[in-house]
């Protein structure tokens, strides 16, 4: 469910979290509000057509921003402008693709505008043309004649990209092949100045006539139109007269076009800037290639009639062409592929068979489960969705057969069918999850089943899908990469001719969730107004096409006949030209095959435990309800633990004190932007801690809200509230949930509201109470989290916490091998593990694996068996009952849980910056054949570049082999020229007596080479100076009184400004003893912006705040840069 919540000021946010009322009458300034967040919403604009008669005209040649840097208006804006101009129709003809047609069709459907779909094809292009001021080759403008013409155009584009020689940015079109595919279903225009006919005019009428005759011979005389355009170039009028003469000679119609590249004159400067970006030149360098004014804008019929007064029939002809070619895009919606089932079965009968097998295994003879499954299957059969479930089940079954960890997430966990098929792991019958949250009788489209896979092995699953369904019937969904603040500022500064250094400096000042500052903004970064003006305009326009992280589309007919397919930059992948919203609007079924880093980490953990400790664990066999796991979480000790490791979650854990599995689901659902904005956090915590009694809006709602202490948190509770007190059906309740989360759901809400109030009255609920219940449902609808999703993730929270508690060395190695993932950098994970007694060692060519691994702490451990190597108490080896957990006692010593005490973590060779997995693998494989005798021995046997050898030396990977880092760096000059296989002849020179590096120098080398300090922390190196200043260590804050002004110093690990924080920025400071959350108000951020934004480490002065459970933070009033002389990195505004 999407959120449509407005930004709230900090004072109100703080009041909602703390429970204290905000100051009465205070109004926050605009500067306190959150910045930019791009969300595509349904088209909801209402342009007004001109009054009175208009000159009929349809624009047949128009480029949107989906011509990627060759159009300055989004398709929706072009539709709006076309309606306001009174056009009879609008064609979208972007370069070599149908990228923007769904957006245009959606907007046109809402506005009642007739639309034509086409594309301007690039002919004779030897390579991608970005970086070229005037791209080579010629253009062929194609309009699809109805649905069949559209399918053939999509097919032709797919062929051009997937044919041998075709690649991203360079389709290979062959005119003969295009004519064969078209087979009379296209209307071909001769094009603008890049059209072959108009280009032929440069060489004379004979050449132009030859090009025109060729088009007629290929596509047919009834399907070729001569295009007239006038961009006020000196030769345009003469060229149009000559083209009209050619058309008359060959009995062809002429059509007048604008060859538009933007909606209105106000986009002209932006269009020029985008052209400069595409050409990789400045605007000054583009002089001569750009038009003199806003000539490529949409024009009204009256303007076109005036412009083409000598060729008025060319204007009139456009309307008949539009009527002949226009169609509704949704008419080409495809169907799912047929799933093969055993002989004698249909898809639904086979699904029922599989479900019955799963029911016996999961539920036995439980009548409640049996009835629930029967209800779900009946609805699945009625909606014709059996094939969808079989496809997902088959993909999951393949992954499980290959040992790939996977599990479904989201609303699918509310389906008992998904549960017994093994797609999800949450029992919806046990938790009472309503199936209608996942699929209801009022839902027409297929349900949405998202499945998480081990991120390392997700590619195997994707390639299985390609292999099973074929490259023409399966493709990944696109991700349209749009301009964000940094790229907007960088590209516009580049177009305006500013230096590379200026571009970099200004773009770095932009934060991920901000917007480029308005011109003359005194509080904004120091960026020139001409840059910010254009950056504001370009925000949100598409920059290039990427690939969606998870979505795949499968169709019965070739999907390339619905949407063109092109190669992705990633090897072995192909991608559609549409994003997920486009696919959804068109009814293409998307299968989300997500890669989850935590599943990778858990899979690696199980492998490491098995390999080094001899113990075999799986997701299913991890003992449940272990008190020690919940005790660890109650202490807020959750760095690295799935979903509960952010500073907000760590701060909430000691207050919520989770003592059972469901508490973990509540933690996941509660600490979210929505519940904070909805005011649910503090009331729940007050009730959880016994400060406030648990009450219910009405006794009938106690069964619904009991599990969340009378506070609605989950979307499923909204539905259950509506069915319990309002006598709504479950389908009505789901419709109410979706309507309340949509700006377009007002009419639906009104009808359901009446039904809900009638039901409450029938249940004897008085009007005041009913109004209160409805207000609670209404305010909660915008922020509720899916309970099914929270429960799915809660299992991974528990499992990752269990491994962190019992096998912290294993957990660290697994997290390092699964990067990038999670909230923290590798350096912070290592520092946290060090505080838990885990020893981490540098990479070593003689000992390291490819990735992080375990090794015994000392040689004496090698004599121990696997049972002796496992340490710690044994209560983790069996399940516990929830009744055994009891209340959390922070003073209780519950024993040593660690079972991998004899092991250290050895960083992998691939952890060294500049050493990829392939290189690390070669080193390990060669070492396993025979140990390396010396550095030059390694250089001869492994094909390493000089940069790779230096990177390993800087990381200390040769220390044992050579003796020191400086000694290794000295030897590199002798071996860089030695190739693999050369004779063992070397010149030996005595290295100079080099001084030993200082600890700070070694620390700097570590951080530069791996980003990780294995033995020390940067702040420890300046601790003496900080102590003399009175700066307090994080681990000593317990002894500092609340509300005292103090100074704390540390490395900045994160900078965050959540959308719910009203402009407040949160910093995480890390010293050698721990982490502290720093709160920077908008005023303080403005005052110290440069220091706060750019400093790698800070000394922060502020007021120490302490929550009810001792959770501490520092409210900053002064920030000062701390020079550590070593490189550190932070994760900013993610």
Swiss-Prot record:
Cellular component GO terms held in the UniProt record: cytoplasm
GO molecular function terms noted in the UniProt entry: 3'-5' exonuclease activity; DNA-directed DNA polymerase activity; nucleic acid binding
Protein location: Cytoplasm
Location of region: Disordered: 1-33
GO biological process annotation, one example: DNA replication
Keywords for this protein: Cytoplasm, DNA damage, DNA repair, DNA replication, DNA-directed DNA polymerase, Nucleotidyltransferase, Transferase
Cross-referenced InterPro entries: DNA_pol3_alpha_NTPase_dom (IPR011708), DNA_pol3_finger (IPR040982), DnaE2 (IPR023073), DnaE2/DnaE/PolC (IPR004805), DNAPol_HHH (IPR029460), NA-bd_OB_tRNA (IPR004365), PHP_dom (IPR004013), Pol/His_phosphatase_N (IPR003141)
Catalytic activity: DNA(n) + a 2'-deoxyribonucleoside 5'-triphosphate = DNA(n+1) + diphosphate
Record Gene3D superfamilies: 1.10.150.870, Metal-dependent hydrolases
Family, as annotated: Belongs to the DNA polymerase type-C family. DnaE2 subfamily.
Protein name in the entry: Error-prone DNA polymerase
Species: Cutibacterium acnes (strain DSM 16379 / KPA171202)
């Amino acid at each position: 469910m999407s959120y449509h919540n407005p930004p709230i000021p900090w004072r109100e946010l703080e009041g909602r979290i703390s429970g204290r009322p905000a100051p009465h009458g205070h109004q926050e300034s605009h500067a306190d509000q959150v910045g930019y967040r791009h969300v595509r919403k349904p088209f909801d604009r209402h342009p007004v057509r001109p009054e009175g008669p208009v000159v009929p005209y349809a624009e047949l040649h128009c480029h949107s921003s989906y011509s990627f840097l060759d159009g300055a208006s989004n398709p929706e804006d072009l539709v709006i402008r076309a309606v306001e101009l009174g056009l009879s129709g609008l064609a979208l003809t972007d370069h070599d693709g149908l990228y923007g047609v769904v957006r245009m069709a959606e907007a046109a459907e809402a506005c009642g505008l007739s639309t034509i779909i086409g594309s301007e094809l690039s002919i004779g292009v030897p390579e991608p043309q970005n970086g070229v001021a005037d791209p080579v080759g010629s253009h062929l403008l194609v309009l699809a004649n109805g649905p069949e013409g559209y399918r053939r155009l999509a097919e032709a584009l797919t062929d051009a990209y997937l044919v041998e020689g075709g690649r991203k940015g360079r389709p290979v079109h062959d005119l003969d092949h295009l004519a064969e595919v078209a087979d009379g279903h296209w209307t071909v225009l001769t094009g603008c100045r890049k059209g072959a006919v108009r280009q032929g005019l440069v060489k004379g009428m004979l050449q132009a006539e030859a090009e025109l005759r060729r088009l007629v011979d290929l596509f047919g005389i009834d399907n070729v139109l001569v295009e007239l355009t006038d961009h006020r170039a000196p030769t345009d009028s003469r060229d149009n007269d000559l083209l009209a003469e050619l058309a008359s000679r060959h009995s062809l119609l002429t059509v007048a076009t604008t060859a538009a590249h933007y909606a209105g004159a106000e986009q002209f400067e932006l269009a020029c800037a985008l052209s400069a970006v595409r050409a990789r030149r400045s605007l000054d360098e583009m002089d001569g290639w750009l038009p003199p004014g806003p000539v490529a804008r949409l024009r009204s019929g009256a303007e076109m009639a005036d412009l083409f007064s000598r060729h008025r029939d060319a204007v009139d002809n456009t309307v008949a062409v539009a009527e002949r070619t226009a169609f509704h895009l949704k008419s080409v919606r495809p169907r799912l592929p047929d799933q093969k089932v055993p002989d004698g079965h249909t898809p639904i009968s086979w699904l029922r068979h599989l479900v019955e097998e799963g029911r016996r295994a999961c539920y036995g003879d439980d009548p409640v489960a049996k009835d629930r499954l029967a209800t779900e299957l009946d609805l699945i059969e009625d909606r014709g969705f059996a094939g969808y479930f079989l496809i997902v089940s088959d993909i999951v079954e393949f992954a499980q057969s290959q040992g790939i960890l996977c599990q479904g997430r989201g609303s699918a966990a509310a389906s008992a069918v998904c549960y017994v098929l093994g797609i999800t792991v949450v029992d919806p019958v046990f938790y009472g999850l309503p199936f209608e949250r996942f699929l209801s009788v009022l839902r027409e489209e297929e349900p949405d089943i998202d499945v998480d896979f081990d991120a390392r092995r997700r590619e195997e699953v994707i390639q299985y899908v390609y292999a099973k369904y074929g490259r023409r019937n399966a493709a990944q969904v696109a991700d349209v990469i749009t301009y964000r603040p940094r790229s907007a500022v960088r590209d516009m500064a580049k177009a305006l001719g500013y230096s590379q250094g200026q571009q970099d400096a200004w773009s770095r000042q932009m934060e991920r969730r901000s917007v480029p500052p308005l011109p003359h903004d005194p509080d904004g970064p120091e960026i020139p107004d001409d840059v910010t003006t254009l950056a504001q305009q370009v925000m949100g326009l598409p920059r290039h096409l990427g690939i969606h992280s998870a979505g795949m589309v499968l169709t019965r007919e070739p999907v390339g006949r619905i949407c063109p397919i092109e190669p992705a930059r990633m090897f072995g992948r192909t991608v559609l030209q549409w994003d997920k919203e486009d696919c959804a609007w068109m009814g293409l079924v998307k299968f989300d095959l997500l890669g989850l880093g935590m599943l990778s980490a858990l899979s690696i953990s199980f492998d490491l435990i098995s390999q080094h400790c001899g113990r075999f664990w799986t997701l299913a066999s991890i003992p449940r309800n272990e008190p020690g796991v919940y005790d660890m979480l109650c202490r807020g000790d959750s760095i690295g633990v799935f979903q509960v490791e952010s500073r907000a979650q760590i701060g909430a854990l000691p207050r919520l004190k989770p003592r059972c599995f469901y508490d973990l689901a509540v933690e996941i659902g509660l600490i979210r932007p929505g519940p904070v904005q909805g005011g649910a956090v503090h009331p729940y915590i007050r009730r959880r801690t016994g400060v406030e009694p648990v009450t219910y809006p009405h006794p009938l709602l106690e069964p619904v809200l009991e599990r969340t202490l009378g506070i609605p948190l989950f979307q499923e509770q909204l539905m259950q509230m509506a069915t319990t007190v309002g006598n709504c059906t479950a389908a009505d309740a789901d419709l109410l949930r979706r309507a309340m989360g949509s700006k377009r759901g007002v009419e639906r809400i009104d009808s359901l509201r009446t039904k809900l109030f009638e039901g409450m009255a029938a249940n004897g609920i008085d009007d005041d109470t009913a109004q209160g219940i409805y207000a609670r449902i209404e305010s909660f609808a915008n922020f509720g989290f899916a309970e099914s999703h929270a429960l799915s993730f809660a299992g991974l929270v528990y499992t990752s916490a269990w491994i962190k508690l019992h096998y912290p060395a294993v957990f660290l190695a697994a997290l390092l091998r699964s990067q990038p993932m999670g909230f923290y950098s590798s350096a912070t994970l290592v520092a946290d593990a060090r505080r838990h007694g885990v020893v981490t060692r540098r990479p070593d060519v003689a000992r390291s694996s490819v990735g992080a691994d375990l090794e015994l702490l000392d040689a004496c451990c090698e004599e121990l068996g696997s049972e002796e190597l496992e340490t710690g108490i044994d209560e983790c080896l069996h399940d516990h009952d929830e009744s055994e957990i009891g209340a959390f006692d922070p003073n209780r010593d519950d024993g040593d849980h660690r079972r991998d005490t004899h092991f250290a973590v050895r960083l992998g060779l691939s952890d060294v910056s500049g050493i990829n997995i392939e290189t690390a693998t070669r080193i390990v494989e060669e070492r396993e054949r025979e140990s390396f005798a010396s550095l030059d021995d390694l250089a001869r046997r492994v094909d390493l570049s000089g940069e790779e050898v230096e990177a390993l030396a800087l990381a200390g990977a040769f220390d044992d082999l050579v003796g020191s880092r400086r000694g290794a760096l000295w030897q590199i000059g002798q071996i860089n020229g030695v190739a693999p296989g050369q004779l063992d002849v070397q010149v030996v020179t005595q290295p100079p007596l080099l001084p030993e590096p200082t600890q700070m120098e070694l620390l700097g080398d570590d951080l530069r080479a791996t980003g990780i300090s294995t033995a020390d922390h940067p702040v420890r190196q300046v601790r003496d100076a900080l102590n003399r200043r009175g700066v307090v260590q994080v681990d000593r804050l317990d002894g500092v009184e609340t509300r005292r002004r103090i100074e704390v110093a540390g490395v900045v690990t994160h900078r965050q400004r959540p959308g719910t924080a009203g402009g407040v920025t949160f910093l995480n400071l890390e010293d050698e003893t721990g982490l502290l959350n720093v709160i920077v108000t908008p005023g303080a951020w403005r005052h110290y912006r440069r220091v706060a934004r750019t400093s790698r480490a800070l000394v922060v002065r502020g007021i120490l705040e302490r929550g009810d459970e001792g959770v501490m933070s520092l409210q900053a009033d002064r920030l000062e840069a701390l020079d550590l002389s070593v490189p550190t990195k932070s994760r900013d505004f993610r």
